[in-house]
Curated annotation (Swiss-Prot):
PANTHER family, per database record: ASPERCRYPTIN BIOSYNTHESIS CLUSTER-SPECIFIC TRANSCRIPTION REGULATOR ATNN-RELATED, TRANSCRIPTIONAL REGULATORY PROTEIN MOC3
Pfam assignment, any one: Zn_clus
Induction (record text): Expression is induced by HAP43 under low iron conditions.
SMART domains given in the database record: GAL4 (SM00066)
Keywords: DNA-binding, Metal-binding, Nucleus, Transcription, Transcription regulation, Virulence, Zinc
Region feature Disordered, mapped onto this chain: 1-203, 336-402
Functional note: Transcriptional regulator of the switch between 2 heritable states, the white and opaque states. These 2 cell types differ in many characteristics, including cell structure, mating competence, and virulence. Each state is heritable for many generations, and switching between states occurs stochastically, at low frequency. WOR2 is necessary for the stability of the opaque state phenotypic switching from the white to the opaque phase is a necessary step for mating. Plays a role in cell adhesion and pseudohyphal growth.
DNA-binding region coordinates: 305-332
Low complexity compositional bias, start-end: 30-64, 87-97, 104-120, 185-195, 358-369
GO function term, MF aspect, one: zinc ion binding
Name of this chain's protein: White-opaque regulator 2
Residue ranges with Polar residues bias: 1-24, 67-86, 121-144, 387-401
PROSITE patterns tied to this protein: ZN2_CY6_FUNGAL_1, ZN2_CY6_FUNGAL_2
Amino acid sequence: MTQLPSVSELINRTGSIGSSSNITRVPPMTTTSATNTTTAATATTVTSTTPRSENSYSPNSPYSLPTRPSNTSLTNYSAGSGITVASSSFQFSQPSPGRSKHNSTSSQSSSGDSFQQHQSNPSGVSMSSNTSPRTSIVQSMSSVPTPPSTGPAPQQFVYQESQLPVQPPPQQQQLQQPPPPPPQQQQHIYPQQQPNFPYHNNFVSPPTYTTAYPQYYYQPVMTPPHHQPHQQAPIHLANNVSILQSQAVMQNAYPTTHYLQHVGPHHIYANVNSQVYYQDMAREEANKALINKRRIIKRRTRTGCLTCRKRRIKCDERKPTCFNCERSKKSCLGYQDLSKLPPRKRNRDTSLDLPDGNQQQQQQQQNQQSIVGGAGNVSDEPHNETHQITSISGSSTNSRNLDMMIPQSFRNNISSQPINFYGPVATTASGASAVINRVSVADLLK
């Protein structure tokens, strides 16, 4: 931060620079009040000091004093508001950074000199009644604008009131501006419509437009013919109307896009499912036809001619010779007599079938023969043996009704286990009755 010079340094540096420059320096003022006089007014005597050149430096400050520009004139001064400048042109310069400190000091000193020059009379004596030199210098420092420095300014911005063009009406100014391109309009429209359309990001990208978009998205871009820029209506009103119309078009186009998005795949899926179903049905029918064809061929191999049966082709069964043999110039060997052929054997599972009555009778006869053979070897009591045979035959006839109730597997197990009738041979009637009882029980279990 630069340090401003004190008031005493400013007073010591004031003075006339020379006749060559346009700035006249007023020497430092010393006010002496007349105490011995009886006059009410106080006279201020101005003592002039030795004038300095423009490039001379003060012993107390290393700053140089610049020249005052010729186009700046002070016309009016007021103690409350400062100095007002009545000139139509002002020059604002951007000082160089190397001499910023010098410019600030020189501007303050020059403003003080110009203020004193305006207040002083031609004779160099000024009368001050209520304002002291220090207050006047401070006011001039705060009110007078900074004059340009003597060094070269890098950039200058000239503002002249007389050269300002007259501002055209807003209607003509708006007509002179070119209309904005459609992508920029869409770039402002889509962020407003994005919350209303949840599928916006899937179809439209605001910055660019390519041919991959659907056709109904090009409608907001095209402007209607009654909104062309060559008309006299303001462009911003036309843009607002086009924005509203584009929003309406988008609202009208959105249900169609929604319908196309959600309904289209259902039709596609239905078509695909129907095609797959028809393909499966065709395959099943082909398989069935192949199976039926094989079955038909197998059935007709016995009814066709012998030549077709050897060739393993379908015979038309024309008699006496088939048409296939005549067409292929083969000798037809004739047909086989099917009445002499045995019936086809069927491989059935007979494990669960019930035995027939003839088989049961044969098994019973075998059992009786085995029992009779064992009893005939006994020579001790023939009468008992005949009684045993009769009792066995009677019990066997009574047990025929129980054969249907006993399973065949259980009967086979009993028949496989032989009964020992030749253990203890009984010589009494009680022994013979025991043998008969054993045989009857065995018959019941069969």
